[in-house]
From Swiss-Prot:
Glycosyltransferase that transfers a galactosyl group from UDP-galactose to soyasapogenol B monoglucuronide in the biosynthetic pathway for soyasaponins. Its EC number is 2.4.1.272. Belongs to the UDP-glycosyltransferase family. It is an enzyme of class 2 (transferase). This is Soyasapogenol B glucuronide galactosyltransferase. InterPro entries: UDP_glucos_trans, UDP_glycos_trans_CS. PROSITE patterns: UDPGT (PS00375). The lineage of its organism: Eukaryota, Viridiplantae, Streptophyta, Embryophyta, Tracheophyta. Keywords: Glycosyltransferase, Transferase. The gene is GmSGT2.
Amino acid sequence: MEKKKGELKSIFLPFLSTSHIIPLVDMARLFALHDVDVTIITTAHNATVFQKSIDLDASRGRPIRTHVVNFPAAQVGLPVGIEAFNVDTPREMTPRIYMGLSLLQQVFEKLFHDLQPDFIVTDMFHPWSVDAAAKLGIPRIMFHGASYLARSAAHSVEQYAPHLEAKFDTDKFVLPGLPDNLEMTRLQLPDWLRSPNQYTELMRTIKQSEKKSYGSLFNSFYDLESAYYEHYKSIMGTKSWGIGPVSLWANQDAQDKAARGYAKEEEEKEGWLKWLNSKAESSVLYVSFGSINKFPYSQLVEIARALEDSGHDFIWVVRKNDGGEGDNFLEEFEKRMKESNKGYLIWGWAPQLLILENPAIGGLVTHCGWNTVVESVNAGLPMATWPLFAEHFFNEKLVVDVLKIGVPVGAKEWRNWNEFGSEVVKREEIGNAIASLMSEEEEDGGMRKRAKELSVAAKSAIKVGGSSHNNMKELIRELKEIKLSKEAQETAPNP
């Protein structure tokens, strides 16, 4: 495709995981909304997560498309369709997905060359792409799927190693050098921060690639974590732009929200929507633990009992555990809740944006994945925090200690995303958090009020003159200047 004069042309390359794909695709759609030509490169199975959204945008005349590449499943010994790090991916297959991804690197680099973009935006887990961009003489911008606080906290642990001073795994220590006095325990830290492993080396490579990049993009906004936005730019010494909340900005009507992710059949949507619409305002608890988490049977029992005993209506998003007592238990529980009309179970993917904005929802129990935290802020909802893996425990600190819009369930132990872990949070702890979250007494000192105020700030950030809107316009302006400067050099006569 020929580039028009003055038109910016870009490539967006997500990682092979739904929680990374969705926000980066929303960012790509925002660039197209601002008249930047966008090509998203991914594999066939992963494209199904967002293709409906791209088709919608293209039908509106926006310059955006998907370029699908074949995942080398046969070469790495994987069944067709297993090409992402998701809840249904068997643990033993994850190393082969990494192998397949490494084989795709040459394919991606060739596309960078052939499509002739003016810049690329790639996920943090593509650190090699900064050198690929340098070869082409174009900027690479890194996408971070986490919060500014989480990245700042990880840097604090790497630089100061405060966990090594703790005598026991459960002893609390302060994370040095941060804008707030945040306490953690060793058990709450990701394993790669506790002691060096292969992932530690990968994260070092990612940090080095970020410092060589033109800058980084975050799904955040200034009023949400302003101190950490400034702190992170200071410690990294690089440019960074918060252009969130991207889900709010890129999905401003019901059609967009319904198309996002693994869209359900219409009759399935009507089921939960009809149930929700029959409930009183702010009376329903939403319970979801993200797109890649599974719980053991023992934990499912504790959650179910806590929800049933709470007396509150609830929607619970549950995952198939490949048969066994966990699935059987949930099916029986679902029948009982249908009979009492107290609970509604959604199996698999849930249209979270549509659910959270429903006036019946009064709060949510969340794993503190960053996408969900931001979407909860958009909706003005307080949270009961249940961190599990990745940077979740850092995000909990932002929600509970900094923003004061959440109450902790009491999870104490970090685990890998594809493991159950040894911790089982008891129904009493879950019940206490739910009671505090859904209380109408405001004993928390205004948690619900603060959540509503942040929702207003989120909406202001993406309006003309808002912090995220200004960041987007400034970044595009800089990228246009780089393009024009490059073109001037290429057309200048030789001395």
